């Protein structure tokens, strides 16, 4: 079976199962599932799987593979292999997910300037990213290493057209001592930022927060390859849809403007549709963008201040991607039944003098 046929069959099968509300091996075009003796993944006859990364496995840099793998992307390596950059959504109190081992015994093997937050040597950031080099011909892992160290709660993010991964911290925490998850937690740095990881890096990148992209509980990012604008989601009940306009297309540390989406004809639109249908399904609405100030705040209130400025409110913005001049995003608990919403933002480049999509429509 060709890959395209497999994907089409799997998709159609999934749609039929969803429509019928049942899951049955008789309805599958691939046959009955066979029990996996390792109790990891049951597959039909003729299918197999390969584990290329496993929590607590020893990596090539001498550190352990962190737990809680989350958002990731694959990049073409210069040698023909594939580099997979993977987030790890870990809290610093969760020592058992750490790359440094449970007692931080491996922490001294990493240069201090490559650890964003060492947590005074007690509770370093246990999130960050790992990079896996994979040989698609031999179907095996070549090497794996930490590529971003000392951050926390790295949830989703997004790949850039210039070959990097934007790793998003889904948290908002401050330096100091606190008691979390029944443990004393020490932090040296502020968290709630986006970090850029070069997918070709053979070791950890210097961890530099992109402060111009805002400090809030980041979820995911999608890059408009034409303009370089970056769209950002926020996983909160009262979240905004953000847009970052970089001063230089592929140099995010050079700063830029952070904005939030607003409905042109109704200020502070609540798109959640919890109490009433403010936004009708399938109907296009003209939008504009509101410039935000104090984007690196001391309080986790950027979304609240943006709403007061007229920005639209979303119900837990999460997944986001760019395709064919549009940006698609999901709101996890939107809608009357709180089962989720999908939005499409159509970029209108004709009204833009700087090709940044200064106006557009959303449905």
Language model segments and positions:
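Conserved small-residue
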Residues: 9-18, 23-318, 322-363
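Twin-arginine (Tat) signal peptide motif
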Residues: 1-7
């Amino acid at each position: 079976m060709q890959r395209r046929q497999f994907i089409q069959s799997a998709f159609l099968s999934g749609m039929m199962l969803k429509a019928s509300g049942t899951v049955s091996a008789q309805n599958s075009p691939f046959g009955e599932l066979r029990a996996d003796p390792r109790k990891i993944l049951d597959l039909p006859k003729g299918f197999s799987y390969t584990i290329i990364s496993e929590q607590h496995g020893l990596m090539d840099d001498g550190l352990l593979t962190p737990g809680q793998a989350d958002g990731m992307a694959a990049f073409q390596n210069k040698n023909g292999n594939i580099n997979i950059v993977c987030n790890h959504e870990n809290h610093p109190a969760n020592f058992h997910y750490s790359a440094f081992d449970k007692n931080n015994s491996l922490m001294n093997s990493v240069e201090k300037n490559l650890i964003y937050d060492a947590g005074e040597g007690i509770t370093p950031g246990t999130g960050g990213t790992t990079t896996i080099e994979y040989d698609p011909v031999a179907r095996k892992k070549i090497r794996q290493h930490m590529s971003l160290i000392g951050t926390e709660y790295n949830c989703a993010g997004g790949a850039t057209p210039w070959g990097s991964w934007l790793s998003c911290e889904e948290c908002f925490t401050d330096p100091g001592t606190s008691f979390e998850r029944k443990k004393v937690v020490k932090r040296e740095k502020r968290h709630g930022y986006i970090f850029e990881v070069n997918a070709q890096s053979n070791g950890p990148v210097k961890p530099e927060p992109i402060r111009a992209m805002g400090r809030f509980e980041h979820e995911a990012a999608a890059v408009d390859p034409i303009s370089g604008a970056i769209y950002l989601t926020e996983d909160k009940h009262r979240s905004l849809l953000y847009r970052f306009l970089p001063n230089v297309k592929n140099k995010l540390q050079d700063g830029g403007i952070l904005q939030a989406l607003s409905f042109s004809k109704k200020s502070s639109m609540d798109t959640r549709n919890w109490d009433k249908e403010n936004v009708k399904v399938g109907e296009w609405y003209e939008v504009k963008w509101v410039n935000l100030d104090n984007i690196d705040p001391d309080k986790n209130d950027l979304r609240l201040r943006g709403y007061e400025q007229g920005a639209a409110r979303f119900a837990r913005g999460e997944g986001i991607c760019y395709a064919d001049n549009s940006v698609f995003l999901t709101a996890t608990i939107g809608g009357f039944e709180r089962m989720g919403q999908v939005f499409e933002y159509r970029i209108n480049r004709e009204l833009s003098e700087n090709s940044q999509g200064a106006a557009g429509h959303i449905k």
